[in-house]
Structure formats: C-alpha cells, structure tokens
Amino acid sequence: QHWSYGLQPG
C-alpha cells in the first residue's frame, strides 16, 4: 500500500 486515510496518495 502506498496511500493513507485522509491524506494525499503517494
């Protein structure tokens, strides 16, 4: 996984 909840992907 390379994304976070509520945060921008990356």
From Swiss-Prot:
The modification Glycine amide is found at residue 10. Signal peptide: none annotated. GO terms for molecular function: hormone activity. Keywords: Amidation, Hormone, Pyrrolidone carboxylic acid, Secreted. GO terms for cellular component: extracellular region. The modification Pyrrolidone carboxylic acid is found at residue 1. It is found in: Secreted. Pfam families: GnRH. It comes from the Eukaryota. Its main location: secreted. Stimulates the secretion of gonadotropins. Belongs to the GnRH family. This is Gonadoliberin-1.
